[in-house]
Design a protein with these regions (language model features):
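Solvent-exposed, flexible loop/coil residues
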Residues: 6, 20, 36, 43, ...
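Mobile active-site "lid"/loop adjacent to the S-adenosyl-L-methionine
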Residues: 5-9, 14-43, 47
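SAM/dcSAM-binding transferase cores
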Residues: 94-142
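Short, flexible active-site-adjacent loop segments at beta-strand->alpha-helix junctions, enriched
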Residues: 13-16, 64, 106
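Residue-level preference for alpha-helix termini and adjacent loops
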Residues: 15, 22, 31, 86-89, ...
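Conserved Class I SAM-dependent methyltransferase catalytic core
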Residues: 37-95, 99
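Short loop/turn elements that flank and shape the SAM/SAH-binding pocket of Class I
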Residues: 1-2
């Protein structure tokens, strides 16, 4: 078991679909992977805050339309967002996801980072996305 205040970093890419509001799957495994079930933003923030030492970081990926819910839950658990970066599937379109980096007991200053754009207006992957993807593949392949 993971002890309280035993970690300096918690990273999470949780399922974000609200039960009953997104397309459901016939596969139990797929449903669990895509829908939050019993893992609300409040429960996720509480779990991260319990695990983190003061000054520890909580990094999470969350859907842009629901980011207020996550930020409110973080605030309730003394997790202060420090860096925020929007993720855009295509240049010029609204973000689909938000990358949040919060610090337990971290104060109130928030830094907005440049958006991460996956594809340009012509549908081609951006240079930054290619670098990120290549770096991940290199780490996996040793």
């Amino acid at each position: 078991a993971l002890g309280a205040q035993s970690r300096t970093l918690v990273v999470c890419n949780p399922p974000y679909g609200r039960d009953g509001s997104a397309l459901t799957s016939h596969s139990e495994t797929t449903r669990i992977a895509r829908h939050e079930g019993g893992l609300s933003p409040e429960e996720l923030a509480r779990a991260a805050a319990r695990l983190l030492r003061s000054g520890g970081r909580f990094c999470v990926v969350y859907p842009a339309p629901r980011i207020y819910e996550m930020m409110r839950a973080m605030d309730d658990c003394r997790l202060a967002p420090k860096r925020i970066r929007t993720v855009h599937g295509v240049a010029g379109r609204a973000p689909k996801l938000v990358l949040l980096d919060a610090v337990k007991d971290g104060g109130s200053q928030l830094h907005w980072l440049e958006p991460l754009v996956l594809r340009d207006a012509d549908g081609e992957y951006t240079d930054e996305w290619r670098r990120i993807y290549r770096m991940g593949a290199e780490r996996r392949n040793g």
